[in-house]
A protein has these predicted regions:
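Aromatic-Pro/Gly-enriched surface loop or interdomain linker
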Residues: 11, 56-145, 198-202
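Solvent-exposed serine/threonine-rich low-complexity stretches and specific carbohydrate-binding patches
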Residues: 28-36
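A glycine-rich, often tryptophan-bearing local segment used as a flexible ligand/cofactor-contacting loop or short
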Residues: 146-221
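Conserved hydrophobic/aromatic "anchor" residues
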Residues: 6, 16, 27, 51-53, ...
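Short S/T/G- and acidic-enriched coil/turn segments that sit immediately N-terminal to beta-strands
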Residues: 35-41, 68
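Conserved aromatic anchor
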Residues: 1-13
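Beta-strand-rich modules
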Residues: 42-61
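Extracellular low-complexity, O-glycosylation-prone stalks/linkers
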Residues: 12-29
Length: 221
């Protein structure tokens, strides 16, 4: 089976509602849980089954907007692939998200992973140590348009990622502002530049490539 876990938010609540989906788009009826519950287990799922979940809070007769959509595929433990959602800017900045809705970007990433089991986690759980990177052979780290204010990789994350890669891990990073945050002409610290250049092994050229098309190198993905 699969287990979904969420943090104990500091607000008045009478319960939670979990919604499950096979594709991250169409969700079934709510599964009602008590306000003291912070995990939900979807049991007896065969190997290879994919599920996507979102959670809402119930209190004072109203239901909150749903959480981000996270998914997983049943397989061996620990999962070969860990999807890390580091895209907070979209959720909290009005200019990025005028409707105030939560996102399903991590779910789309899960759907693109063909074959191996995967789990999805918020980057805060990686920072806290609740979900370590080390057991997973591959990590997909999503940053969207995270930049200087929200930070693409903060000091704690840089250390965790560097240690993971030095131990032989494999990392795929997706983000539009990583180079600007960590290696633009002025602003980044020496530690940020070092991480970008020697750990991520990237080279910052300009703030805008002026294209949405690219061709991978022969030895690339």
């Amino acid at each position: 089976g699969l287990t979904l876990a969420w943090s104990n938010e500091d607000f008045v609540r009478t319960g939670y509602r979990v919604y499950a989906s096979d594709d991250g788009v169409t969700f079934g009826p709510p599964i009602n849980l008590g306000g003291h519950m912070h995990t939900f287990t979807d049991p007896n799922l065969p190997v290879g089954t994919e599920r996507y979940y979102r959670v809402s809070v119930v209190g004072s007769g109203v239901e909150s907007k749903p959480s981000r959509i996270y998914g997983a595929r049943v397989g061996r433990t620990p999962s070969p692939v860990l999807v890390v959602d580091g895209n907070d800017r979209w959720s909290f900045q009005t200019s990025e998200n005028p409707a105030g809705a939560n996102h399903g970007f991590a779910a789309l990433t899960g759907r693109s992973i063909s074959g191996p089991a995967f789990d999805t986690v918020h980057h805060g759980a990686v920072i806290s140590g609740a979900v370590p990177l080390s057991p997973h052979p591959a990590v997909v780290w999503l940053l969207g348009e995270e930049s200087t204010a929200d930070e693409t990789f903060d000091a704690a994350e840089r250390t965790l990622v560097a240690n993971y890669l030095n131990a032989g891990g494999n990392l795929f990073v997706s983000g539009a502002e990583i180079g600007w945050h960590l290696d633009r002409a002025s602003g980044p610290t020496a530690a940020e530049r070092n991480f970008y250049r020697t750990v991520l092994r990237a080279a910052y050229v300009a703030d805008d490539a002026n294209t949405y098309a690219f061709v991978p190198t022969g030895a690339g993905i």
